[in-house]
């Protein structure tokens, strides 16, 4: 059966997460329902990452197997038609090898987290940022973030229900960026690794916020990491503000990615 990769963008607010759940709205369920309107189902799609409730997607990648030989552009157009009015869009589609897998073929995942610093309630960015009413020291946060780079046992920074076989991961990037947006001053976190533990990024951000607020010193983050104890973690920040921004593969999958790489 022909296999297709889909690049997916979605607003996570109305969904119970990516993964299909009985009697609850999910991004996976929305796409599988749209696929069933193109070809008889049932259809099951696999994704590079299963984002939690309220987490958004800018560059999620999934794959599906279809019986018909679709032109990728027409496939994306047809899916987008049937996905309306839900806040889910297929921004690209590509034919891939039958053994290509959205999750297992991926070599890296990149997340973005937006933290807005202002006292007035966010209106246009409501649900798209984590908002705090105080300023944060981005330099101190970066100093603490640097201590987390590399290969470590991240037991402190994973949820108690994490199903990963090992807490050891390699963190390739954790960059703290101060940005002046139209809504106000933001801190943006750029986080990149081959794979992540459950709630790892939100645990990082919640802990680093404490550093930026002056409640923790950067060295306290090192102590928390070395404790290998969930109780040593700072607060876990809320899901709004977190985006799965990009998934990387050994070779570019979509036409726009191939053009950028050449």
UniProtKB/Swiss-Prot annotation:
Enzyme class label: isomerase
GO molecular function, one term: RNA binding
Highest taxon, organism lineage: Bacteria
Catalytic activities: uridine(38/39/40) in tRNA = pseudouridine(38/39/40) in tRNA
Active site: 52 (nucleophile)
Record bears the keyword Isomerase: yes
Residue numbers binding substrate: 111
Biological process according to GO: tRNA pseudouridine synthesis
Pfam families, per database record: PseudoU_synth_1 (PF01416)
EC number: 5.4.99.12
CDD domains registered for this protein in UniProt: PseudoU_synth_EcTruA
UniProt keywords, alphabetically: Isomerase, tRNA processing
Coiled-coil features, chain-numbered ranges: none
Similarity annotation: Belongs to the tRNA pseudouridine synthase TruA family.
General function of this protein: Formation of pseudouridine at positions 38, 39 and 40 in the anticodon stem and loop of transfer RNAs.
Protein name listed in UniProt: tRNA pseudouridine synthase A
Organism: Ruegeria pomeroyi (strain ATCC 700808 / DSM 15171 / DSS-3) (Silicibacter pomeroyi)
Gene designation per UniProt: truA
């Amino acid at each position: 059966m022909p296999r297709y990769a889909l690049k997916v963008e979605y607003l996570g607010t109305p969904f119970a997460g990516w993964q299909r759940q009985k009697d609850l709205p999910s991004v996976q369920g929305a796409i599988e329902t749209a696929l069933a309107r193109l070809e008889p189902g049932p259809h099951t799609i696999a994704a590079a990452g299963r984002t939690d409730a309220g987490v958004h997607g800018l560059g999620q990648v999934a794959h599906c197997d279809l019986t018909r030989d679709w032109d990728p552009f027409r496939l994306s157009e047809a899916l987008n038609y049937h996905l309306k009015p839900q806040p889910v869009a297929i921004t690209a589609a590509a034919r891939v090898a039958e053994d290509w897998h959205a999750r297992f073929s991926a070599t890296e995942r990149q997340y973005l987290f937006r933290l807005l610093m202002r006292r007035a309630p966010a209106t246009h960015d409501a649900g798209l940022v984590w908002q705090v009413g105080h300023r944060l020291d981005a330099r101190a946060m970066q100093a603490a973030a640097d201590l987390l780079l590399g290969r470590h046992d991240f037991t402190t920074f994973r949820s108690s229900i994490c199903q990963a076989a090992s807490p050891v991961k390699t963190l390739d990037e954790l960059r703290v960026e101060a940005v002046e947006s139209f809504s106000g001053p933001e801190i943006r976190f750029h986080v990149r690794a081959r794979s992540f533990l459950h709630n790892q990024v939100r645990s990082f951000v919640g802990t680093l916020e404490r550093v930026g607020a002056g409640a923790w010193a950067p060295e306290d983050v090192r102590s928390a990491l070395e404790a290998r104890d969930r109780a040593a973690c700072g607060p876990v920040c809320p899901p709004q503000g977190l985006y799965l921004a990009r998934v990387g593969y050994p070779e570019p999958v979509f036409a726009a990615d191939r053009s950028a790489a050449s």
